[in-house]
Amino acid sequence: MKLGFIGAGNMAQAMIGGILAKGIVKKDEIIASAATQKTIDKVSEEFGVNVTLDNTEVAKADIVFLAVKPVYYQEVIDEIKSVVNENQIIISVAAGKSVEWVENAFGGEKKIVRIMPNTPALVGEAVTAICPNKNVSDEEKKVVSELLSSFGIAQFINENIMDAVIAVSGSSPAYVFMFIEAMADAAVAEGMPRAQAYQFAAQSVLGSETGKHPGELKDMVCSPAGTTIEAVKVLEEKGFRSSVIEAMSACADKSRNM
């Protein structure tokens, strides 16, 4: 099985790293392209995979990941669609580009899978939504799921909730990073060294995954008349929850209108 990545930025590199780490394919079975020599040199050096500046070479792979920014999708598809056939699987990694949009851009009866991973793929902890079109067989769905599970967890969804997925997982790492940064800033203001503040804040988030309901976990930390409930009280007064909800709503709206 040959895998191709058109676009070799952070997300593509995270996916390549995860797939290789699980031994799903060998290095020489992956080829990646990018717009600059600097990027493909970096990918070649770090992962030992085949690289090229020619997108049409990558488009000959059995499974082709379109990992360029949405604004370049039409241009790249126009470049490669004469090379792509009905037996290949095209995996679209872009916000705002529906399965139908990608189908129409390629034309014909292509096998299209729309996915939305997130940047925790860089540490093998991504959550990836998967939405295949009707041309993808059950066996091919299993193959795609195995690939995407190599750098985190992967779940099939209905495309009508993809905008919600983008808001709750695709973009949400940025919200968490901002939260960690704000906590670290507050710790620095209280006298903690910057590097240590980031470590404490980040580890507190990392250690919060238990499988329990978040409300239950919050209550476990909030002792009566304690310091934590005092902090929670201020967060509620300042509209912490509503800010998060409104931000995610804006994110989903942006995805719908791209």
Q: What is the meaning of each model-derived region?
A:
Residues V165-A174, A195, K218:
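A short glycine-threonine-serine/GTX helix/turn-capping micro-motif
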Residues Q37, E45-F47, N55-A59, I63-I130, ...:
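Rossmann-like NAD(P)(H) cofactor-binding subdomain of soluble oxidoreductases
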Residues I30, I40, V58, P193-F200, ...:
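Small-residue helix-packing motif on alpha-helices
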Residues W101-K111, V127-A164, F177-K212, K254:
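Internal alpha-helical scaffold of NAD(P)-dependent oxidoreductase catalytic cores
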